[in-house]
């Protein structure tokens, strides 16, 4: 087996720390395992994404270690037995130009900034 890189060692260390911090908190260990398993297939060359996920994991670890976290879970909308996944590109699901906002600030109450900064 080849020697692990520094980033790989950090990720494995984070995994162990998250599992330890999640002991005794309902759903935490399963959530940690599922999250790491989901991203295990990331290519080693995708360093930016790996570093982003590492930083996100560090923040979650801090939350777990703080006394405020009592459990860990996810927000998942279960699909019904006959419900199909929605395909945004299907002809019946396409937004026409009249439905789309013309300006990203439209509808937010934010003022539009002119290109000269005023």
From Swiss-Prot:
One Pfam family recorded for the sequence: Complex1_LYR
Annotated localization: Mitochondrion matrix
Any one biological process term the GO annotation gives: mitochondrial respiratory chain complex II assembly
GO CC terms, sorted: mitochondrial matrix; mitochondrion; nucleoplasm
Residue ranges of the motif LYR motif 2: 53-55
Biased composition (Basic and acidic residues): 109-118
Region of interest called Interaction with SDHB, as start-end residue ranges on this chain: 53-65
Region annotated Disordered, chain positions: 72-118
Keyword entries, A-Z: Chaperone, Mitochondrion, Repeat
Cross-referenced InterPro entries: Complex1_LYR_dom, Complex1_LYR_SDHAF1_LYRM8, SDHAF1
Tree of life domain: Eukaryota
Job of this protein: Plays an essential role in the assembly of succinate dehydrogenase (SDH), an enzyme complex (also referred to as respiratory complex II) that is a component of both the tricarboxylic acid (TCA) cycle and the mitochondrial electron transport chain, and which couples the oxidation of succinate to fumarate with the reduction of ubiquinone (coenzyme Q) to ubiquinol. Promotes maturation of the iron-sulfur protein subunit Sdhb of the SDH catalytic dimer, protecting it from the deleterious effects of oxidants. May act together with SDHAF3.
Record family assignment: Belongs to the complex I LYR family. SDHAF1 subfamily.
Subunit structure: Interacts with SDHB within an SDHA-SDHB subcomplex. Also interacts with the iron-sulfur transfer complex formed by HSC20, HSPA9 and ISCU through direct binding to HSC20. Binding of SDHAF1 to SDHB precedes and is necessary for recruitment of the iron-sulfur transfer complex by SDHAF1.
Protein name: Succinate dehydrogenase assembly factor 1, mitochondrial
Organism encoding this protein: Rattus norvegicus (Rat)
Upper taxonomic lineage: Eukaryota, Metazoa, Chordata, Craniata, Vertebrata
């Amino acid at each position: 087996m080849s020697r692990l890189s520094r980033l790989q060692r950090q990720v494995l260390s984070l995994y162990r720390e998250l599992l330890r911090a999640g002991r005794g908190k309902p759903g935490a260990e399963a959530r940690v395992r599922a999250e790491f398993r989901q991203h295990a297939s990331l290519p080693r060359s995708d360093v930016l994404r790996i570093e982003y996920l590492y930083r996100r994991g560090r923040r979650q670890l801090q939350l777990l270690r703080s006394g405020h976290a009592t459990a860990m879970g996810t927000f998942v909308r279960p699909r019904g037995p006959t419900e199909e996944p929605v395909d945004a590109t299907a002809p019946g699901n396409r937004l026409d130009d009249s439905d789309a906002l013309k300006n990203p600030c439209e509808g937010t109450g934010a003022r539009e900034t002119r290109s000269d900064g005023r």
